[in-house]
């Protein structure tokens, strides 16, 4: 399934007039071009209506207000709700029609930020719910008269809460051990730098990356014109292997013609995955996820036990990370990206005793608080790691 508004997936398979429902192009292969506008209207209509009212009151013309009420990249994230629908269908039917679902979703800067939206919304809504929401309701007439701007009603806040619940469910789906992200790049230095940043950000957000596909690689013997490109690509490909080790790196050669149609697309896939002798490109990735917790024993007489939260942050040094403790949450900031980690109940009671970054892994150490020394908790046994 593709979330690309330009319908590039439908074009690649030579489908004309493909609708928003899955279309079978080969036995066992279905293609879907997601109707992002439909999801946008369903999930964002109340909120966009309120934002239009605010902008209208501020004197913004109608057409400009219509554009400003759509968050850049939101359509792509909302399209992932269609993925959730497919998984629900799978569970309801006790197996369902799909063995695997592949989502063509470009990891742009906006999309990476919006993948953090569910947790950010939860942090915000936790602070406008309960007494704060009742206070807002009581003060709504006063605030409206004082500012001259519309104040969000219950239906707007409820719509945001529904969207947050939907996106949290999508997030839980995407961070399962069976789910993973596969990066696609071309062997160019600028593209490689962006792919490295994408790996760091995806790991920070808790998404597992299972490998890298290097696309449009000039094959040997392509001719004198391509010799310069081939030499330059060979240098970058060596950096790709070094940068992403131990992740597998597949290479796909530059095709003689644009691959359009099921046969041409299948040929590209066979070329890429044969480059490493991969038998099952859809195999569930092994090994720990990007975020996990490990129990630590007492370090000496009179010391309390502890735990270590580990977050994979490739290409990051200690000075690149900012940490802040906020109640039961740990706020991790790397460059322009921030993640609010809601700590397990056990760790939420324990103070942070230190943090370092070693070999691309952020290690945040907690020491048991005196009041919790005898309490039951959900920290794993000593030396054992468990996923976040």
What is each residue range found by the language model?
Residues 332-334, 364:
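Short hydrophobic/aromatic-rich beta-strand segments that constitute the beta-sheet cores
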Residues 317-321, 331, 354:
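A basic, amphipathic helix-loop patch mediating RNA/tRNA/ribosome contacts
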Residues 168-318, 327, 336-351, 367-388:
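C-terminal lobe/tail of nucleotide-utilizing enzymes
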Residues 358-369:
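C-terminal beta-strand-rich structural cap/linker in extracellular carbohydrate-active enzymes
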Residues 2-175, 187, 241, 251:
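Flexible phosphate-sensing "switch/lid" loops adjacent to ATP/NTP-binding sites
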């Amino acid at each position: 399934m593709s979330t690309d508004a330009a319908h590039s997936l439908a074009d690649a398979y030579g489908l004309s007039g493909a609708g928003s429902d899955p279309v079978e192009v080969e036995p066992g292969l279905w293609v879907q071009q997601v109707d992002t506008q439909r999801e946008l209207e369903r999930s964002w209509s109340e909120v966009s209506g309120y934002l239009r009212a605010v902008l209208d009151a501020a004197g913004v013309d109608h057409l400009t207000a219509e554009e400003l009420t759509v968050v850049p990249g939101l359509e792509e994230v909302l399209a992932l709700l269609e993925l959730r629908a497919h998984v629900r269908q799978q569970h309801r039917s006790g197996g369902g029609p799909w063995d695997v679902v592949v989502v063509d979703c470009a990891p742009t800067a906006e999309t990476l930020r919006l993948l953090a939206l569910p947790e950010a919304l939860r942090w915000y809504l936790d602070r406008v719910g309960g007494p704060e929401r009742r206070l807002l309701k009581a003060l709504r007439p006063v605030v409206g008269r004082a500012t001259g701007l519309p104040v969000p009603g219950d239906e707007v806040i409820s719509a945001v809460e529904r969207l947050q619940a939907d996106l949290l469910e999508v997030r839980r789906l995407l961070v399962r051990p069976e789910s993973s992200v596969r990066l696609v790049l071309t062997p160019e230095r600028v593209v490689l730098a962006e792919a490295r940043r994408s790996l760091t950000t995806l790991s920070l957000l808790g998404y597992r990356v299972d490998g890298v596909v290097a696309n449009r690689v000039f094959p040997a013997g392509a001719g004198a014109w391509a010799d310069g490109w081939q030499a330059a690509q060979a240098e970058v490909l060596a950096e790709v292997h070094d940068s992403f080790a131990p992740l597998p790196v597949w290479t796909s050669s530059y095709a003689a013609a644009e691959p359009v149609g099921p046969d041409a697309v299948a040929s590209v896939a066979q070329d890429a995955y044969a480059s490493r002798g991969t038998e099952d490109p859809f195999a569930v990735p092994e090994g720990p996820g990007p975020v996990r917790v490990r129990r630590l024993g007492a370090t000496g007489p009179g010391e309390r036990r502890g735990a270590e939260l580990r977050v994979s942050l490739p290409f990051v040094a200690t000075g690149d990370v900012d940490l802040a403790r906020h109640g039961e949450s740990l706020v991790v900031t790397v460059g322009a990206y921030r993640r609010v980690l809601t700590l397990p109940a056990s760790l939420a009671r324990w103070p942070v005793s230190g943090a370092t970054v070693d070999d691309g892994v952020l290690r945040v150490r907690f020491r048991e608080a005196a009041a919790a020394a005898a309490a039951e908790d959900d920290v794993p046994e000593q030396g054992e790691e468990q996923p976040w």
